[in-house]
Amino acid sequence: MQAMLPVILILLLPCIALASTATRATPEQLRKCKFQQPWSFLDCYHEKSDFPTYWIVIVGIINILSCTFFSITIYPTFNFGWNSPNALGYPQEPDEHIPLQHIQQPLALVEYENEPQPSLPPAISYFNLTGGDD
Protein backbone atom coordinates (compact mmCIF):
# COMPACT_ATOMS: atom_id res chain seq x y z
CA MET A 1 0.00 0.00 0.00
CA GLN A 2 2.91 2.34 0.73
CA ALA A 3 4.34 1.66 -2.72
CA MET A 4 1.14 2.93 -4.32
CA LEU A 5 1.46 6.44 -2.85
CA PRO A 6 4.52 7.47 -4.93
CA VAL A 7 2.88 6.07 -8.06
CA ILE A 8 -0.26 8.11 -7.43
CA LEU A 9 1.77 11.25 -6.76
CA ILE A 10 3.76 10.76 -9.96
CA LEU A 11 0.53 10.37 -11.91
CA LEU A 12 -0.85 13.58 -10.40
CA LEU A 13 2.23 15.69 -11.17
CA PRO A 14 1.16 16.57 -14.75
CA CYS A 15 -2.21 17.76 -13.48
CA ILE A 16 -0.59 19.99 -10.87
CA ALA A 17 1.96 21.34 -13.33
CA LEU A 18 -0.65 22.19 -15.95
CA ALA A 19 -2.93 23.80 -13.39
CA SER A 20 -0.15 26.00 -12.04
CA THR A 21 0.97 27.17 -15.50
CA ALA A 22 -2.56 28.05 -16.62
CA THR A 23 -3.49 31.70 -16.65
CA ARG A 24 -4.76 32.80 -13.29
CA ALA A 25 -8.13 34.50 -13.06
CA THR A 26 -8.74 37.44 -10.82
CA PRO A 27 -10.83 36.87 -7.70
CA GLU A 28 -13.67 38.91 -9.24
CA GLN A 29 -13.84 36.50 -12.17
CA LEU A 30 -13.78 33.51 -9.86
CA ARG A 31 -16.70 34.88 -7.86
CA LYS A 32 -19.11 35.08 -10.79
CA CYS A 33 -21.27 32.26 -9.43
CA LYS A 34 -22.17 32.72 -5.80
CA PHE A 35 -23.91 29.91 -4.00
CA GLN A 36 -25.56 32.34 -1.61
CA GLN A 37 -27.39 33.99 -4.55
CA PRO A 38 -29.58 31.22 -6.00
CA TRP A 39 -31.58 33.71 -8.11
CA SER A 40 -28.51 34.36 -10.29
CA PHE A 41 -27.66 30.69 -10.73
CA LEU A 42 -29.22 30.34 -14.19
CA ASP A 43 -27.36 33.40 -15.51
CA CYS A 44 -24.11 32.03 -14.17
CA TYR A 45 -24.91 28.49 -15.30
CA HIS A 46 -25.01 29.45 -18.97
CA GLU A 47 -21.65 31.21 -18.90
CA LYS A 48 -18.70 29.42 -20.44
CA SER A 49 -16.29 28.01 -17.90
CA ASP A 50 -12.59 28.84 -18.08
CA PHE A 51 -11.77 25.30 -17.01
CA PRO A 52 -11.63 22.89 -19.98
CA THR A 53 -14.27 20.19 -19.90
CA TYR A 54 -11.90 17.39 -20.87
CA TRP A 55 -10.16 17.79 -17.50
CA ILE A 56 -13.38 16.81 -15.76
CA VAL A 57 -13.52 13.66 -17.88
CA ILE A 58 -9.86 12.88 -17.16
CA VAL A 59 -10.34 13.38 -13.41
CA GLY A 60 -13.45 11.15 -13.51
CA ILE A 61 -11.62 8.37 -15.34
CA ILE A 62 -8.66 8.58 -12.93
CA ASN A 63 -11.09 8.46 -10.00
CA ILE A 64 -12.88 5.38 -11.33
CA LEU A 65 -9.63 3.56 -12.15
CA SER A 66 -7.99 4.37 -8.82
CA CYS A 67 -11.08 3.26 -6.85
CA THR A 68 -11.25 0.05 -8.86
CA PHE A 69 -7.55 -0.66 -8.33
CA PHE A 70 -7.86 0.11 -4.61
CA SER A 71 -10.87 -2.18 -4.19
CA ILE A 72 -9.19 -5.03 -6.07
CA THR A 73 -6.10 -4.53 -3.90
CA ILE A 74 -7.92 -4.74 -0.56
CA TYR A 75 -10.46 -7.41 -1.60
CA PRO A 76 -8.36 -10.43 -0.46
CA THR A 77 -7.95 -8.96 3.02
CA PHE A 78 -11.64 -9.40 3.81
CA ASN A 79 -12.10 -12.79 5.42
CA PHE A 80 -15.88 -13.08 5.61
CA GLY A 81 -18.84 -13.76 3.38
CA TRP A 82 -18.20 -15.56 0.14
CA ASN A 83 -14.41 -15.29 0.65
CA SER A 84 -14.50 -17.79 3.49
CA PRO A 85 -17.69 -19.84 3.50
CA ASN A 86 -16.36 -22.13 6.24
CA ALA A 87 -15.38 -19.34 8.63
CA LEU A 88 -18.14 -20.19 11.10
CA GLY A 89 -18.23 -23.94 10.41
CA TYR A 90 -16.64 -25.12 13.62
CA PRO A 91 -16.92 -28.84 14.38
CA GLN A 92 -19.67 -29.60 16.87
CA GLU A 93 -18.03 -31.99 19.31
CA PRO A 94 -19.13 -32.46 22.92
CA ASP A 95 -16.84 -31.17 25.60
CA GLU A 96 -14.44 -33.74 26.97
CA HIS A 97 -15.11 -32.95 30.63
CA ILE A 98 -18.84 -33.81 30.43
CA PRO A 99 -19.43 -37.57 30.44
CA LEU A 100 -21.94 -38.72 27.85
CA GLN A 101 -24.13 -40.56 30.38
CA HIS A 102 -24.81 -37.32 32.27
CA ILE A 103 -26.16 -35.53 29.23
CA GLN A 104 -29.90 -35.33 29.74
CA GLN A 105 -32.23 -36.26 26.97
CA PRO A 106 -34.78 -33.61 26.05
CA LEU A 107 -38.04 -34.13 27.89
CA ALA A 108 -41.11 -34.71 25.80
CA LEU A 109 -43.65 -32.27 27.15
CA VAL A 110 -46.56 -33.88 25.35
CA GLU A 111 -46.48 -37.49 24.28
CA TYR A 112 -48.54 -37.44 21.13
CA GLU A 113 -48.31 -41.19 20.54
CA ASN A 114 -50.13 -42.00 23.78
CA GLU A 115 -52.99 -39.54 23.26
CA PRO A 116 -56.18 -40.81 21.64
CA GLN A 117 -56.50 -39.72 18.04
CA PRO A 118 -59.74 -38.02 17.02
CA SER A 119 -61.77 -40.04 14.58
CA LEU A 120 -61.85 -38.82 11.02
CA PRO A 121 -65.11 -37.41 9.72
CA PRO A 122 -67.04 -39.80 7.49
CA ALA A 123 -66.52 -39.44 3.78
CA ILE A 124 -69.71 -38.24 2.15
CA SER A 125 -69.89 -38.29 -1.60
CA TYR A 126 -71.19 -35.33 -3.52
CA PHE A 127 -73.49 -37.68 -5.40
CA ASN A 128 -75.02 -38.95 -2.16
CA LEU A 129 -75.86 -35.39 -1.12
CA THR A 130 -77.55 -34.43 -4.37
CA GLY A 131 -79.42 -37.66 -4.75
CA GLY A 132 -77.97 -38.79 -8.03
CA ASP A 133 -75.28 -38.34 -10.62
CA ASP A 134 -76.23 -34.86 -11.76
UniProtKB/Swiss-Prot annotation:
Keywords: Early protein, Glycoprotein, Host membrane, Membrane, Phosphoprotein, Signal, Transmembrane, Transmembrane helix. The chain crosses the membrane at residues 54-78. Down-regulates the EGF receptor and prevents cytolysis by TNF. It is found in: Host membrane. Residues 1-19 form the signal peptide. Belongs to the adenoviridae E3_14 family. It is a single-pass membrane protein. This is Early E3B 14.9 kDa protein. Phosphorylated on serine; O-glycosylated, but not N-glycosylated. GO terms for biological process: regulation of signal transduction. One of its GO terms (cellular component) is membrane.
